[in-house]
Swiss-Prot record:
Swiss-Prot/TrEMBL catalytic activity: dTMP + ATP = dTDP + ADP
Name of the protein described by the UniProt record: Thymidylate kinase
GO-annotated biological processes: dTDP biosynthetic process; dTTP biosynthetic process; dUDP biosynthetic process
Keyword Iron: no
Record-linked InterPro entries: P-loop_NTPase (IPR027417), Thymidylate_kin-like_dom (IPR039430), Thymidylate_kin_CS (IPR018095), Thymidylate_kinase (IPR018094)
Family, as annotated: Belongs to the thymidylate kinase family.
EC class: transferase
Alphabetically ordered keywords of this record: ATP-binding, Kinase, Nucleotide biosynthesis, Nucleotide-binding, Transferase
Taxonomic source organism: Haemophilus influenzae (strain ATCC 51907 / DSM 11121 / KW20 / Rd)
GO terms assigned for molecular function: ATP binding; dTMP kinase activity
Top-level taxon of the source organism: Bacteria
C-alpha cells in the first residue's frame, strides 16, 4: 500500500511541533506505525546546508528570488530522496512545511510574481502534492509573540508585521481553494487545538478509507 503525505503549515508560533505530535498520535491510533517526519527547508544533507543559508544572515544580501530558488532546491532534494521513496515503501510522511509555505511567504509576504511562482512550482514539483494539509491559523502578532518567547529570531522571523499579515492572507486564500486542506484555529488552548487536529485527521481518514 502506498503511503500518504500529511503536511502541517502555519506562521511562526502557530504550534507546528505540537501539531506534529497530535498527527502522529492519531495515526498510531489508526494503526499507522511507520511514520517519517520531515521539515522544510531541510531533511537531507544538502537541504540542511541550504536551510542555514536561507535562515541566517550572510555576507551579502539574499535576493527574494535567490531565497525562493534555494527553497525549491532544498524541497526537490527532500521530495526525491526522502519523501517519495518513503511513500513508495508504504510509509506515511508528516511534514513540517511544504510548497504552500513558499506560496504564502514568498508569494504573499515577499510579493513575488504569481506567474513566476506557478511556473517554478510546476517545473520543480509537477503534480506532486500532499494528501492532506493542516493549516494552523493564527494572528501574526500572537504568533510572533510566541516565537520571540522561544529566543532569537531567524532572518525571516525578523520581518515586519505587515510581511506576516500578507503571508497569512495568502495562506487563507490557498486553503480556501484547496479541498485537501483544513484550517485549525491555533489561537485556542493547546488542548482544543490538539482535539481539532485529531478530529480533522480522523474525518479525513474516514472519507479516504478504501
Amino acid at each position: 500500500m502506498k503511503g500518504k503525505f500529511i503536511v502541517i503549515e502555519g506562521l511562526e508560533g502557530a504550534g507546528k511541533s505540537s501539531a506534529h505530535q497530535s498527527v502522529v498520535r492519531v495515526l498510531h491510533e489508526l494503526g499507522i506505525q511507520d511514520v517519517v517526519f520531515t521539515r522544510e527547508p531541510g531533511g537531507t544533507p544538502l537541504a540542511e546546508k541550504l536551510r542555514h543559508l536561507i535562515k541566517h544572515e550572510t555576507e551579502e544580501p539574499v535576493t527574494d528570488k535567490a531565497e525562493l530558488l534555494m527553497l525549491y532546491a532544498a524541497r526537490i532534494q527532500l521530495v526525491e530522496n526522502v519523501i517519495k521513496p518513503a511513500l513508495m515503501q508504504g510509509k506515511w510522511v508528516v511534514g513540517d512545511r511544504h510548497d504552500m509555505s513558499s506560496q504564502a511567504y514568498q508569494g504573499g509576504g515577499r510579493q513575488l510574481d504569481p506567474h513566476f511562482m506557478l511556473t517554478l512550482k510546476e517545473t520543480v514539483l509537477g503534480n506532486f502534492e500532499p494528501d492532506l494539509t493542516i493549516y494552523l491559523d493564527i494572528d501574526p502578532s500572537v504568533g510572533l509573540a510566541r516565537a520571540r518567547g522561544r529566543g532569537e529570531l531567524d532572518r525571516i522571523e525578523q520581518m515586519d508585521l505587515d510581511f506576516f499579515h500578507r503571508t497569512r492572507a495568502r495562506y487563507l486564500e490557498l486553503v480556501k481553494d484547496n479541498p485537501k486542506a483544513v484550517v485549525i484555529n491555533a489561537e485556542q488552548s493547546i488542548e482544543l487545538v490538539q482535539a481539532d487536529i485529531e478530529s480533522a485527521v480522523k474525518n479525513w481518514w474516514k472519507s479516504n478509507e478504501k
